[in-house]
Amino acid sequence: MNDVDLISIESTKWDYGWWSADKLKEGTDWRSLEGAWADSTVRHPSLLNLMSAAGATSLKSYATKLKARGINFTVYLLLHDTLDASGNPTGEYGEFNSVKHPDWFSNRLVTTAMGHSADLGNAACVEYLKTSLTDFFGGNLIPTWRTDFEPICRSSDKENRHYKNGSDVMYWCTKGFDEVITHLIENVPGFRYESCSSGGSMKDLYTGTVATVINCDDSANWLSLRTTFYDSSYVIHPAQLQIPVNINSFNTDSPMFWPEMSTSYSGDGYDFHDALIDMGFRSAILGPPMFATFGGGLMREKVAEYSMLYREKVRPIQKSGELYHILPRPDGVNWDGVMYADPDTSADIKGIVFLFKPSDKAGNVKNVVLRGLDPQKSYKLSFEDNTDADCVKTGESLMTDGINVTVAGIGSEIIWITEAE
């Protein structure tokens, strides 16, 4: 919590497993007690240490400290049966289990060593969740719920509002989930919903109406996330497409650096490591970034720099403007890029262009035709890196003839578009 001001944190997330100290199966990270969240007991040793370091003795007291610092608290919570350390259903931790309520749970297993998925076609189960989740999030001052692993069950051997093994299972489970989410929005102050669902599988129009953010994918890799953002943003609003990136995936000093790439370019002032760091962070701020590290090395100054850049410059036009796919889909070889534009905004920035050159094969110069500007106005283009290329052009010229952009070696560029004086 001491890093809050230094790295410009707005939100922090507790992910899978905070409720348990026991792994169900050697060689996996799946844990017991997935459904034992209602008692708000934190059992994971690392998070207990984190709470202790912050001077907190409970989930609520930790949330209170975060709230006092102006930080949103997101807690991951599953709608799965409660299993003990041996992998058997147990009724010792409250009501949400198949021992006490066998009809609340389907025969759907997302993966082995997990509890069966809740069947939200069951009206009694839905009513329990409406009350207990409101108590959990509202009572602990936690504003954001992050779901995962199919909160909306896709199959069930139970018969309730849907048929046993029927084709209407997902319909009624979606209806039940919506009843729960609507209740939380109406009864938990400032409630936010984050959808992960096995790494972004719930990218649909219903989820888009209730989720503040939707996970792009679970790779945690900058190039994969840039690709799924490109694809998903044709349908889902880019301000909702969360980019949860492991910053070591673009750190050339890390064993997690991937994909492997190199350049033959060695011009004055060019640093391959620095170029990859900037390209990775710029990939992450295409949508709402979620920065993480696996294996240490947080790069606090860079996290702070790009967090502020996203918050102050990208997010406003991301919300008010339009996103344009101005170059082909990222493939790790050729130039790719997108741009935001809002010619009618009262803000200074009328557009932002993100360009990426991931290989020497792509060539150093790319002609880029822009979109979404006012053809009758003149615009100043300010390059983040190659400031010698700053220029003034009309919207008509930019959207007809385009502009030539140079990136030597492997790298990226941001172009800020303002109205010319």
What do the predicted segments below correspond to?
Residues 1-131, 142-144, 154:
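Aromatic-lined carbohydrate-binding/catalytic grooves of carbohydrate-active enzymes
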Residues 79, 356-358, 419:
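Short beta-strand segments enriched in hydrophobic/aromatic residues
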Residues 6-8, 74-76, 144-146, 192-195, ...:
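Structured core elements
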Residues 138, 151, 177-390:
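Active-site-proximal substrate-binding groove within the catalytic cores of carbohydrate-active enzymes
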Residues 18, 85-94, 155-161, 202-213, ...:
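Histidine/acidic-residue-rich catalytic or RNA/ligand-binding cores of hydrolases
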Residues 12, 17-22, 113-187, 191, ...:
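Polysaccharide-binding and catalytic clefts of secreted carbohydrate-active enzymes
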Residues 392-421:
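C-terminal beta-strand-rich structural cap/linker in extracellular carbohydrate-active enzymes
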Residues 55, 173, 273:
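Charged, low-complexity surface patches
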